[in-house]
Curated annotation (Swiss-Prot):
Protein name from the UniProt record: Thymidine phosphorylase
MF GO annotations: 1,4-alpha-oligoglucan phosphorylase activity; thymidine phosphorylase activity
Function: The enzymes which catalyze the reversible phosphorolysis of pyrimidine nucleosides are involved in the degradation of these compounds and in their utilization as carbon and energy sources, or in the rescue of pyrimidine bases for nucleotide synthesis.
Catalytic activity: thymidine + phosphate = 2-deoxy-alpha-D-ribose 1-phosphate + thymine
Statement: the UniProt record of this protein carries the keyword Disulfide bond: no
GO annotations of cellular component type: cytosol
Matches recorded under SMART domains: PYNP_C
Length: 440
């Protein structure tokens, strides 16, 4: 039997916590026998004293085990359970293509996703732009979709890692959100509760990233890879660029439209293709679905070219109560803003930098994201035809097309877009789309 205050005291004094102490505290959070003040105190001691790798693994496992851990054995699936998690960005719509692509190659992708957070878009918000799409199927329906379709994208239910919800809410109001051991445990508790064989992390770097610097992004990626592998889930991470909007669009309906066009081959943004392919390659390799990178790329290209990936996406939408002909008729189903017109720079020049975070906040201000958890979402608004770094802009080449529902909103968004984009005389040095691969 332990006392919560003694566990806090031990960590306060810089001593490592045992697996049993960590599990006791986390179960206490779940069972409401540990107070908010005690959670806040432990979070702050971890923030200042960090955690060893064994402590980080124990914390993650305890948070995972605070609720249901999915078990797929009874389904006798003939392929690996694999997933991807992104630290979030703007125009980061990879999940919508990646899940179907990997499923079309023989993987099973039970993706539990989130809402938009701050300037970053949320996969669930994007999918809810599809009429009727059910992000909370019951457990039986979820399992059936995975078995029959190979991929489902759903929201987190209250039974998955419940301790994390309470822990995170306390961190949010005590300035302890940006603690790497706590971020790692929060991300992985939910992902490992999916019962995965393998996971790939997409950790963003740059002006639209969760972490403010490259070195902190790299630290987070290494921490997640180390802890997840320590917890028995084969995990790799890619550090990818978020110094500009990843897709050509940012918003909800507009990103779903781009995802369908990507899958059908109508249009594939080169940067989005590079990141999506690289993440899918990791999933195929970690899941044993390909011999090497070349084999993985060939398989993925084949399911794009022969239409299998688009077909799987359509089947997933139908299985989750969306329209059965969504892929064929997406334009007739997705909401359209009343006002769509381009915004131009006030002078001629070359785009040398983008404040990607500010562009994400411009979408939020249009109604495409939430300032408070209770805010409604406008699925029709957003940015499309985003100019890229190094593009020369003038009276003919716009910065973006803004989709708004009134002139005032359009004007505010236009000001925000202009302010977020820096022009100069010389093209910026090209940054890699993928900076680094982390395997341990």
């Amino acid at each position: 039997m332990f006392l919560a205050q003694e566990i806090i005291r031990k960590k306060r004094d810089g001593q490592p916590l045992s697996e049993e102490e960590i599990r006791f505290f986390i179960n206490g959070i779940r069972d409401n026998v540990v107070s908010e003040g005690q959670i806040a105190a432990l979070a702050m001691t971890i923030y200042f004293h960090d955690m060893s790798m064994p402590e980080r693994v124990a914390l993650t496992m305890a948070m995972r085990d605070s609720g249901t851990v999915l078990n797929w054995k009874s389904l006798n699936l003939n392929g690996p359970l694999v997933d991807k998690h992104s630290t979030g960005g703007v125009g980061d719509v990879t999940s919508l293509m990646l899940g179907p692509m990997v499923a079309a190659c023989g993987g099973y992708v039970p993706m539990i996703s989130g809402r938009g957070l701050g300037h970053t878009g949320g996969t669930l918000d994007k999918l809810e732009a599809i009429p009727g799409f059910d992000i909370f199927p019951d457990d039986n329906a979820f399992r059936k979709i995975i078995q029959n379709v190979g991929v489902a994208i759903i929201g987190q239910t209250s039974s998955l890692a419940p301790a994390d919800k309470r822990f995170y809410a306390t961190r949010d109001i005590t300035a302890t959100v940006d603690s790497i051991p706590l971020i790692t445990a929060s991300i992985l508790a939910k992902k490992l509760a999916e019962g995965l064989d393998a996971l790939v992390m997409d950790v963003k770097v740059g002006s639209g990233a969760f972490m403010p610097t490259y070195s902190l992004s790299a630290d987070l990626a290494q921490a997640i890879v180390g802890v997840a592998n320590g917890a028995g889930c084969k995990t790799t991470a890619l550090l990818t660029d978020m110094n500009q909007v990843l897709a050509s669009s940012a918003g909800n309906g507009v990103e779903v439209r781009e995802a369908v066009r990507f899958l059908t081959g109508e249009y594939r943004n080169p940067r989005l293709l590079e990141v999506t392919m690289a993440l899918c390659v990791e999933m195929l390799l970690s899941g044993g679905l390909a011999h090497d990178e070349a084999d993985a790329r060939a398989k993925l290209q084949a399911v794009l070219d022969n239409g299998k990936a688009a077909e799987v996406f359509g089947r997933m939408v139908a299985a989750q109560k969306g329209p059965v002909d969504f892929v064929e008729r997406y334009d007739s189903y997705l909401p359209v803003a009343t006002l769509s017109k381009p915004v131009f720079a006030e002078q001629t020049g070359i785009i040398t930098a983008m404040d990607t975070r500010a562009l994400g906040m411009a979408v939020v201000a249009l109604g495409g994201g939430r300032r408070r958890a209770t805010d409604p979402i406008d699925y029709s608004v957003g940015l499309t035809e985003m100019a890229r770094l190094g593009t020369r802009v003038d009276g003919q080449q716009p910065l973006a097309v803004i989709h708004a529902n009134n002139e005032d909103d359009w004007q505010q968004a236009a000001e925000a877009v202009r302010a977020a984009i820096t022009l100069g005389n010389n093209a910026p040095e090209e940054t890699p789309v993928i900076y680094r691969r982390i395997t341990e």
